[in-house]
């Protein structure tokens, strides 16, 4: 039995798409357990590039079962747009390759309207939402007024729940947020059409995943975003609306913790984040700009430029602790090639002492000053390496320090965006 998790160990955008695609070769089932189409994965296979948002990365293989679990929030319109995109580039998406939990919450048009209007109302205190309705959908889930996929499969149930939600949401949208009311009939007709297309993909995914694990099939749980965007352990409130840590797997798909054998944390060789929020090692200078351009650090989903900075090992160590990481995959060491000197954060100066953990309070975090160690850089030959031995010595020293500080072995190294630009040095 082998069931393992692939998680982001930073603020997302660590290269999970590529690593999930790489590791999916060893898996028979690939499962998304949280988030929605606010996530973005880029996978390069040969000379082709694929951009995924909601559908698991295993869809690029013909022989993998891909699962969207109950912890995911599903926008049917975005789902079928992604299916059409994949079909258009030659990737088949059928109910034999993709199944969707009947317990997953549906993103509705009013969720997206609320997302945009509430963000606008926050003014300078906006949190950088993607505007895709993710947060409002999770809010409805916990307020117990959300509409699930299984509700959409029963027209009378869906109609009743939609009518109640439209009545309440329109009052809030018009009277509090100053927006335009949404049409009940338009949404009803649109979603009943979605129901017909969605039905063949829908089943109890918890049972399906459980059965596959019991049959000793290899299952890969694919995380979206990153540890520091977790609703509990991230830089709150500049976070996403779900649990992005290993704990989210059990509730987000419906399997017990004893069924998960390993957890791989994905980290870049440097640090990035999108939008607002604290970033202790951020480089607001030419070096930061250089990393952004060389690393093509622009969001897959939003197109927003990413803030760039030195590698912060305090963050990665926190991710290893919170999610019980059994190994790390370090990506994009090729991006740093050409820099003569590098810095790595190994602690924060805070209130006269050095700490190696991430404070909960943003006010405390703002007072933290990074403690750096210096490293010599390496050249572009790193992108040609296919074994650990072929890596430049300075790159090896850099990687060894990551493993030492986080007390977590490195199992995989990414030296470029393509599937074949991956070095496997240990088991996960």
UniProtKB/Swiss-Prot annotation:
Q: Name the positions where Mg(2+) binds.
A: 13, 40
Matches recorded under CDD domains? AdSS (cd03108)
Sorted keywords for this record are:
Cytoplasm, GTP-binding, Ligase, Magnesium, Metal-binding, Nucleotide-binding, Purine biosynthesis
Pathway assigned to this chain's UniProt record: Purine metabolism; AMP biosynthesis via de novo pathway; AMP from IMP: step 1/2
Instruction: Look up the record and name the cofactor or cofactors this protein needs.
Output: Mg(2+)
Q: Which SUPFAM superfamilies does UniProt cross-reference here?
A: P-loop containing nucleoside triphosphate hydrolases
Amino-acid positions noted as binding GTP in the UniProt annotation, renumbered to this chain: 12-18, 40-42, 306, 332-334, 414-416
Where do transmembrane segments lie in this chain? Answer: none
- Which compartments does it reside in? Cytoplasm
The protein's enzyme class: ligase
Q: Where does IMP bind?
A: 13-16, 38-41, 130, 144, 225, 240, 304
Q: Give yes or no: UniProt keyword Transmembrane helix.
A: no
Q: Which InterPro entries match?
A: Adenylosuccin_syn_GTP-bd, Adenylosuccin_syn_Lys_AS, Adenylosuccinate_synth_dom1, Adenylosuccinate_synth_dom2, Adenylosuccinate_synth_dom3, Adenylosuccinate_synthetase, P-loop_NTPase
Give the matching PROSITE patterns: ADENYLOSUCCIN_SYN_1 (PS01266), ADENYLOSUCCIN_SYN_2 (PS00513)
Q: Main localization of the protein?
A: cytoplasm
The residues responsible for catalysis, as annotated, are: 13, 41
Q: Which family does it belong to?
A: Belongs to the adenylosuccinate synthetase family.
Assembly mode: Homodimer.
Q: What is this protein called?
A: Adenylosuccinate synthetase
Q: Which organism is it from?
A: Clostridium botulinum (strain Alaska E43 / Type E3)
Q: Which gene encodes it?
A: purA
């Amino acid at each position: 039995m082998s069931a393992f998790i692939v998680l982001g160990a930073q603020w997302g955008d660590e290269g999970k798409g590529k690593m999930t695609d790489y590791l999916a070769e060893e898996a028979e089932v690939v499962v998304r357990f949280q988030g929605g189409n606010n996530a973005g994965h880029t996978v390069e296979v040969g000379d082709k590039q694929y951009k995924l948002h909601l559908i698991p990365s295993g869809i690029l293989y013909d022989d993998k079962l891909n699962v969207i679990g109950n912890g995911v929030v599903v926008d049917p319109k975005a789902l079928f747009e992604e299916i059409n995109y994949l079909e258009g580039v030659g990737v088949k998406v059928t109910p034999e390759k993709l199944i969707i939990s009947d317990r997953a919450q549906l993103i509705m048009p009013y969720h997206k309207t609320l997302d945009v209007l509430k963000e606008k109302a926050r003014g300078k205190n906006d949190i950088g939402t993607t505007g895709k309705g993710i947060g409002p959908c999770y809010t409805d889930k916990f307020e117990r007024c959300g509409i699930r996929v299984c509700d959409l499969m029963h027209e009378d149930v869906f109609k009743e729940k939609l009518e109640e939600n439209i009545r309440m949401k329109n009052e809030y949208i018009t009277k509090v947020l100053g927006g335009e009311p949404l049409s009940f009939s338009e949404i009803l007709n649109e979603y009943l059409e979605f129901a017909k297309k969605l039905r063949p993909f829908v089943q109890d995914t918890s049972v399906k995943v459980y059965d596959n694990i019991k049959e000793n099939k290899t299952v890969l749980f694919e995380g979206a975003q990153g540890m520091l965007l977790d609703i509990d352990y991230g830089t709150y409130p500049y976070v996403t609306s779900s649990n992005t840590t290993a704990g989210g797997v059990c509730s987000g798909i419906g399997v017990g913790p004893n069924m998960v054998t390993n957890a791989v944390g994905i980290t870049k060789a440097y640090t990035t984040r999108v939008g607002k929020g604290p970033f202790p090692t951020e480089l607001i200078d030419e070096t930061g700009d250089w990393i952004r351009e060389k690393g093509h650090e622009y969001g897959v989903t939003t197109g927003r430029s990413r803030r760039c900075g030195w590698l912060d090992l305090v963050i990665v160590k926190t991710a290893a602790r919170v999610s019980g990481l059994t190994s790390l995959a370090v990506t994009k060491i090729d991006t740093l090639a050409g820099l003569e000197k590098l810095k790595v954060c190994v602690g924060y100066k805070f209130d006269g002492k050095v700490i190696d953990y991430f404070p909960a309070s943003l006010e405390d975090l703002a007072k933290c000053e990074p403690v750096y160690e210096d490293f010599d850089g390496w050249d572009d030959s790193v992108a040609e390496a296919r074994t650990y031995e072929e890596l430049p010595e300075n790159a090896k020293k850099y990687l060894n320090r990551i493993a030492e500080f986080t007390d977590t072995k490195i199992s995989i190294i990414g030296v470029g965006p393509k599937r074949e630009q991956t070095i496997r040095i240990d088991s996960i």
